Amino acid sequence: MLRTHSLGELNASLIGQTVTVTGWVARRRDHGGVAFVDLRDASGFAQVVVRDEADFDPLRNEWVLQVTGTVERRPEGNENPNLPSGEIELIAETVTVLNTAAALPFQVDEHVEVGEEARLRHRYLDLRRPQPSRIMRLRSEVNRTARELLHGEGFVEVETPTLTRSTPEGARDFLVPARLAPGSWYALPQSPQLFKQLLQVGGIEKYYQIARCYRDEDFRADRQPEFTQLDIEASFVEQDDVIALGEKIVKALWALVGVDVPTPIRRMTYAEAMEKYGSDKPDLRFGLELTDLTEYFKDTPFRVFQNEYVGAVVMPGGASQARRTLDAWQEWAKQRGAKGLAYVLIQEDGELTGPVSKNISEEEKAGLAAAVGANPGDCVFFAAGKPKESRALLGAARVEIGRRCGLFTDAGDGVAAKDADWAFVWVVDAPMFEPAADAVASGDVAVGAGAWTAVHHAFTSPKPEFADTFDADPGSALAYAYDIVCNGNEIGGGSIRIHRRDVQERVFEVMGLSPEEANEKFGFLLEGFKYGAPPHGGIAFGWDRVVALLAGTDSIREVIAFPKTGGGFDPLTGAPAPITAQQRKEAGVDAQPEPKQAEAEPEA
């Protein structure tokens, strides 16, 4: 071994002992013939005293050293209570340089602000900094905790293929050419969905996996083309069983950061979430529910409010906002595809001012504050139009109001997780289908060519009361699905699955997949359902998002060892990169698949 102790192990119990340690030079300070070196390794820091000028003179930051010396107590008054090794120092007897370091592109110091591009380009240096290092270790603990819990529940960890066939699942596939089958392609899995269902057909009964998933999506903020999920599936379960297991996992994970999550966690229907919060992932750390004013303004003279839906959200104290701030709200709304954000200001004397107040009737003005629950000094924002789009705008405004008014406290930026606000909710009874045009408009890929596509995925079972009617009335059918939301972030989603071939074929038909197309894409699943598939269901947690919340960081890039940028580019390796003409030829990128040979007739 190159060392006898890690730096984090050095403490007063070792005073008088000779030890050998290794690490990087974090900082050096010269004091007239003696140098103090702050040495860093993965476990922490320790102060090394080097008295030989020949040893300390050449040392520079991030050089890699091996130091042998004696542990001594620091002189009185020089202790550092912020370090586990703060009572002692290591008096160096020998200093060996294991490697030198070139001039650094940025300082390996958590107190120095560094641009994300530089940090990702030199991620190996960034990971030496305390916070990224802590996050990697937290992620390891999260993995270990989940594995131990699921093992205790009788689950089996099974690895599913990462080279499979392309199956439409709601996003675009990453495709891999098959060199030995020119013109044919593998796809990287968007999720282990089909394989974990087939494991239930295979009698595994309780499966889990910390799975890598791949989706070739359009550039979106804080999305990664490859991501991780904790994937779980079990046979002979109902919704309550999966939810109970999910709550055990959440409780165990948040306990790692000192947060006790009360269970059972509240449940809310999708319809209630959209009506009250304008989102299927509501942030319940604060109130400010939306108010439906459609009936209130049914006879309004204001043409803008003569619409299918009119709603409002209150900003406490918002009447004191400057005009430029109110104008900025309009730009904020336009960035979200709206024409603007109508408002009224309720003055301290109760008078209504602002653009909307000039266009509504005196009777409407008189009762408005009471209708929306506003007080003098508040601002009321409105949206009118299609219910889905209008509620979404108000829901986003609600969260922005909560942030600007300080109605909740996030972890991070000096706030420990145990001191932050946390609110969890299960959102249940979501629609089974949505118009395919809506899915495409939001950046997803419709699975079939029909007018409808699945909200969750094509393998989600309808709720029992819709089992016989979902194909006749797709817009009314509810899914046997459940999503868990934390502080406005969806951290997991699951459903009871379809386990009967006839039901699965009916779902494919609603989505516009012909029997031939369904058999071509999903024939292996439909075939499996012929042989006694058990009732089953599961859940998948977005592992990167879970770790980001626990770590108190806004970006999932911070919790991935080597992340891509928002555009899918890797500054470290330069991926994606062109391939050579030879590679292109060998991979068969431009090859056409050979026609399938007709199967030979069986002999009589």
Swiss-Prot record:
Alphabetical keyword list: Aminoacyl-tRNA synthetase, ATP-binding, Cytoplasm, Ligase, Nucleotide-binding, Protein biosynthesis
EC numbers for this chain: 6.1.1.23
Catalysed conversion reaction: tRNA(Asx) + L-aspartate + ATP = L-aspartyl-tRNA(Asx) + AMP + diphosphate
GO cellular component labels: cytoplasm
Disordered: region residues: 571-604
Binding residue positions for L-aspartate: 169, 215, 456, 497
Listed GO MF terms: aspartate-tRNA ligase activity; aspartate-tRNA(Asn) ligase activity; ATP binding; nucleic acid binding
Transmembrane segments: none
Cellular location(s): Cytoplasm
GO annotation (BP), single: aspartyl-tRNA aminoacylation
Main localization, broad class: cytoplasm
Site, as annotated: Important for tRNA non-discrimination: 31, 77
UniProt region (Aspartate), positions on chain: 193-196
Ligand binding (ATP): 215-217, 224, 490, 542-545
Role played: Aspartyl-tRNA synthetase with relaxed tRNA specificity since it is able to aspartylate not only its cognate tRNA(Asp) but also tRNA(Asn). Reaction proceeds in two steps: L-aspartate is first activated by ATP to form Asp-AMP and then transferred to the acceptor end of tRNA(Asp/Asn).
Family designation: Belongs to the class-II aminoacyl-tRNA synthetase family. Type 1 subfamily.
Quaternary structure and interacting proteins, as annotated: Homodimer.
Annotated protein name in UniProt: Aspartate--tRNA(Asp/Asn) ligase
Organism classification: Bacteria, Bacillati, Actinomycetota, Actinomycetes, Micrococcales
